[in-house]
Amino acid sequence: MPRQPRNTSGIKHRAGELRKISTPAEAKLWDCLRRNKINGVSFRRQHAVDKYITDFCSPREKLIIELDGSQHGGDMDAERTRFLMERGYKVIRFWNEDVIKDIENVLLVIRQALEK
């Protein structure tokens, strides 16, 4: 399998900055994902995949989790999802509000995605 091209320093820097300013929903989900808590799977937070920075990514499982707030949606998210899927990733999306109010269901969906 060909290796993914190295991230540019600008993307890496931006990903590092985003890790410092997590939303409440990102922080809550990260607490559930970190240290391989779900099915023993390792996730990375604010991980760059080519030209995009993903909210959460398991490179080994090729699974990306995106959290959406009011600033997301539309053609740009569709293009981003298409781009990532073309590179073999499965992308699942949740609304920030769902993570805050119904984390158990969010975790169930993630577990199901990992089992497929």
Residue ranges and their predicted role:
Residues 18, 22, 47-113:
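Basic, amphipathic alpha-helical patches used to engage nucleic acids or provide basic targeting signals
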